[in-house]
């Protein structure tokens, strides 16, 4: 094969199968000098493997070294695939075409994308119109589309989604998407609305105009604080490394595109960490012992694609540690343990990972910070911890029922969440009310926690419980459980109230604010009342903007939107709203 040799940096060798030994056989790295026919053969083979591989164990990353690629190359992104450029800037790496369609669920004309989960694209330029027909647990970030972006496949069902730090030269068309979060983006125009379209930090004049609820647009003018997700780069002088963007405050628009042009590399606000500062993990050879040893030695971890079965938690004790996954690297708890336990409160980054419950019940999959009466405060003026592109799963993939009490517990103060899907499986293997059991999705006990694009679904009690002060959520999507057998199995407040709210803020909280919420019911198996979709304290510092409840289909229903405010949803397609709560 052509283009396979030693790089100018580090004198490291790429194999004829487009792999580097340091990253293993599930990471492909292409160069503009490679034979385009051979590149396309690899891309086609990966799509053939992964298009329908919803609960498979295979994971892949496809990286493109900086440069412009042959016009014949077209990438399609299937399950557990990540496609990315290796430049510092998206325009450093240019590929002709990238798409994700939704044709695999059947031959009918619906083009159903509601199961197009677990995939991502970042840090490159696509030189044509792009179809990105996806749902939850996906990401498109730091991308330049030199055409239009379609978030649907011919208006088939879709339930996304997340777009961040991206430039779209023409229109972005949401089509049939139920909901979507766009953060720090720019485009020529936005087309489409459905139940809950949320925009944060969009370039001036580019967020769509419309009055909610006639148009389902919720706009948050600026992003108060954000650390963009770190990403793998190849530097011609330094070799492979990870670029770590610095914190931006009160930001609007795309971080790498200013005044109508791409910024220069030297203008980027961040630091390059050489790959030598990372332990490069491989699922075939690494386990909790080798990974914890690396963490104790002060290393960051770069998880290459694969499924890592852990008998003990990975313990993060050092400030500023980075855990970065690629190719939807998956950490699976197999002995009732957590996957990750973070004890330091200072500027930890965890991103690009799928955390999977095992068949022995765990209390948690991720614990950020210690749950104590007096939490250690982060340094004044310091950077937040970042949790980005993090996905959690209970059931669906294993031959025995998966179990957990709750997936995520955030005890630390000053945390940014950026794109979560926390999912108790409603389909797949060993799925049912008494099989894949899980009480809660997300528990927040820390103060000053802000989450963008929080999606939590199908848990057996509250989906989300928030006890910390000054919490903020910008875009929330949630479906209550489909499989409640009967009302008596689904009672809150010590059995006195029918059903569980999806989102509950503790009555002792004084300050909390939310924007763009959509909570949906599909009581498939029984008539089940959910008294209210959201429970909030009635206090001056508690505010909610644009909250809707929808009964998709099935049995009724949702009685109120917030507490005992709003209309009921007792028939298929019924939608009730609260415009403002304060």
Q: Where do the language-model regions lie?
A:
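C-terminal segment of classical bacterial N-terminal signal peptides
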Residues: 1-3
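Extracellular/periplasmic carbohydrate-active domains that bind, remodel
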Residues: 5-582
């Amino acid at each position: 094969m052509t283009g396979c040799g030693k790089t100018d940096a580090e004198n490291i060798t790429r194999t004829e199968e487009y792999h580097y030994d340091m990253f293993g056989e599930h990471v492909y790295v292409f160069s503009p000098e490679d034979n385009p026919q051979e590149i396309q053969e690899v891309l086609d083979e990966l799509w053939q493997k992964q298009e329908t591989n919803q609960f498979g164990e295979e994971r892949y990353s496809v990286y493109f070294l900086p440069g412009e690629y042959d016009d014949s190359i077209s990438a399609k992104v299937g399950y557990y695939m990540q496609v990315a450029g290796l430049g510092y800037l998206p325009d450093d790496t240019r590929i002709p075409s990238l798409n994700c369609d939704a044709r695999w669920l059947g031959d009918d004309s619906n083009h159903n994308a509601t199961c197009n989960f677990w995939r991502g694209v970042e840090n490159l330029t696509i030189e044509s119109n792009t179809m990105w027909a996806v749902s939850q647990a996906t990401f498109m970030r730091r991308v330049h589309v030199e055409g239009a972006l379609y978030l649907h496949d011919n208006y088939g069902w879709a339930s996304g989604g997340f777009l961040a730090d991206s430039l779209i030269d023409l229109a972005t068309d949401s089509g049939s998407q139920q909901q979507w979060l766009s953060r720090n983006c720019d485009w020529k125009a936005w087309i489409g609305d459905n139940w809950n379209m949320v925009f944060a930090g969009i370039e001036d004049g580019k967020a769509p105009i419309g009055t909610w609820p006639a148009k389902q647009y919720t706009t948050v003018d600026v992003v108060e604080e954000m650390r963009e997700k770190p990403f793998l780069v190849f530097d011609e002088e330094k070799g492979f490394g990870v670029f770590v963007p610095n914190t931006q405050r009160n930001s609007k628009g795309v971080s790498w595109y200013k005044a109508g042009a791409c910024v220069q590399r030297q203008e980027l606000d961040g630091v390059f960490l050489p790959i030598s500062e990372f332990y490069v993990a491989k699922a075939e050879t690494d386990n909790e012992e080798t990974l914890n040893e690396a963490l104790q030695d002060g290393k960051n971890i770069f998880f290459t694609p694969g499924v890592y079965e852990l008998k003990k938690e990975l313990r993060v004790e050092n400030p500023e540690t980075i855990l970065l996954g690629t190719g939807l690297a998956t950490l699976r708890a197999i002995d009732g343990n957590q996957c990750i336990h973070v004890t330091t409160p200072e500027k930890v980054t965890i991103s690009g990972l799928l955390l999977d419950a095992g068949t022995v019940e765990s209390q948690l999959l991720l614990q950020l910070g210690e749950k104590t009466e007096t939490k250690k405060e982060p340094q004044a003026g310091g950077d937040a911890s970042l949790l980005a592109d993090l996905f959690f799963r209970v059931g669906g993939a294993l031959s025995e029922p998966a179990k957990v009490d709750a997936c995520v517990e955030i005890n630390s103060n000053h945390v940014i969440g950026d794109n979560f899907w926390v999912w108790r499986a409603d389909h797949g293997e060993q799925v049912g009310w008494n099989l894949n059991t899980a009480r809660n999705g997300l528990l927040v006990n820390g103060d000053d926690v802000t989450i963008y694009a929080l999606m939590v679904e199908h848990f057996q009690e509250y989906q989300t419980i928030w006890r910390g002060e000054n919490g903020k959520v910008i875009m929330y999507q949630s479906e209550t459980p489909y499989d409640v057998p009967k009302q008596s199995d689904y009672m809150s407040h010590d059995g006195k109230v029918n059903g569980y709210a999806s989102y509950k803020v503790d009555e002792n909280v004084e300050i909390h604010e939310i924007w763009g919420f959509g909570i949906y019911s599909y009581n498939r198996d029984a008539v089940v009342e959910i008294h209210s979709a959201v429970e909030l304290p009635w206090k001056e510092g508690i505010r909610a903007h644009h909250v809707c409840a929808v009964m998709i289909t099935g049995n009724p229903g949702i009685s109120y939107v917030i507490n005992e405010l709003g209309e009921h949803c007792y028939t298929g397609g019924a939608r009730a709203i609260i415009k403002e709560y304060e």
